[in-house]
Amino acid sequence: MSINRISKNELLANYDTFLFDADGVLWTGDIPVPGAIEWINLLLEDPSKKVFVLTNNSTKTLEQYMKKIEKLGFGHLGRNNVISPAIVLADYLKSNADKFSGEYVYLIGTENLKATLENDGGVKCFGTGPDSIRDHTDGDFIHKVDMSIAPKAVVCSYDAHFSYPKIMKASNYLQDPSVEYLVTNQDYTFPGPVPGVVIPGSGATSAAVTAVTGRDPKVFGKPHKPMADFLLRRAHVDPKRTVMFGDRLDTDIMFGNANGQLSATPIQCQNESENSEPQKQGWISRLLKGQSMDPSSWQKQSHSSLLSNSELMYEFMTHNYRPGEQDAYLDAFGKYKNEMNQKNPSIELVGSWTCAYGRTRDQAIHLWRHNKGYEDVDSSISLHGKDSGIRAADNDVAKLCGRRKNLIVKSFSYWREPEQRPPNHVYDLRSYVLQPGTMIDWASAWAKGIQYRREANQDVGGFFAQVGQLYVVYHIWAYPSMSGRNDTRHATWAKPGWDATVANTVPLIKKMQSKILTPTKYSQLE
């Protein structure tokens, strides 16, 4: 596996222009990534450096976006530091004033995008909001829509009012080859604040229009060329001295690669210092302290400090209860859980399951989160040795079991932390015993591959062993049913790029197994 080496000092010496994706790189939701503000300010203070935030979000005006940036603490960034598809598209319309100035554009998009295109692009937009045709229930098909306005272009973007009449109008306008077909970006989904809720993006609207018309659009967002051309015109950047920081392979990294820039992902940023102490850091915090993208530097740190930026510890508790004793076992375990909650509330039971399919049938698996890290692990050891209530409850569980084991694990930084899920799911616990020395290679491959396994919100957690059998990885996936699991896995294989993840990880595996789990009444993961 070939990974280029680069340090912070080399970045500053060899690169003049720094491009950043926004959500997931500089901030997550409404929380700045640790070290991001300091890194941006450091670059802005150097007059020889150019800094740009490249977002694919066209739902906000520039003024609204700047207010968000300032609120997050990035107040040193100015209007000229932010580039969005809406800005690039407006510039395109303005640059072709002989065709578009004062002319109509049919817009499948938001009122904010309309304001940007009209104010900065010099066009007149129509089509936003709910479609004006109210009732299509009197027949099987719509045979006629209002085509009285003749636009010079059709623009597709995110539109919460997207509808069949809009597809029909756009498709009919585009029958005229002189009408240009313009798209802000082709992101099929947007990140959102509610786990499990899929938010269709601009790519969903344009895909429908493209399918009907057979026309290929001109796309203005990452990874397409118009945004790179706009950047060249605005800043006269040298691609060979430009670095693109992003978290999405299909937009950010592809954009950098396609335009001759250095591409960097958060998983690549590692601390070079041998003596630095483990801290809860973001990838930019590590970059500020000195980064490396060279496997030789990984030997200077423990695997856990490279693979996880969380202080949380997790514990897999596996109990093989006696056949026919499941109800009695779960009652005893419930009392044990209550004792633990009372004696140390920061040790939290996240998941609790019994095995429906797998190597061992009469088995329960519980996932505990130690919110204070090793402090909670020490507390658990002490409680099991000295507290009479814990010892009694633990003994009652043990009497119903033939075999028990406890493993300490940490979560990979590129996975989410396990979050509470509503009913009803089946869970697939996959364990992989890796060849010694291959954990970094595994993480590097999966940091890219995980993007292919998130569209159905199936990713629950990914962990690597700290105590117990080492070089073992655990992945937990959630599905609405076994048939849903089958459909989701088939859909993953249809995605270009997933096969590369499999090809890169299978040679690293010594042994693997899958268990299908169903939640108990104690589980937050239902």
UniProtKB/Swiss-Prot annotation:
Known InterPro entries for this protein? Dimeric_a/b-barrel (IPR011008), HAD-like_sf (IPR036412), HAD-SF_hydro_IIA (IPR006357), HAD_sf (IPR023214), NIPSNAP (IPR012577), NipSnap_domain (IPR051557), PGP_euk (IPR006349)
Q: Which domain of life is it from?
A: Eukaryota
Which biological processes are named by the entry's GO terms?
mitophagy
> Per its record, what are the GO molecular function terms?
phosphatase activity
Q: Which CDD domains match?
A: HAD_PNPase_UmpH-like
Which NCBIfam families does this entry report, sorted A to Z?
HAD-SF-IIA, PGP_euk
| Family to which the UniProt record says this protein belongs | Belongs to the NipSnap family.
Name of this chain's protein: Putative NipSnap protein K02D10.1
Q: Which source organism?
A: Caenorhabditis elegans
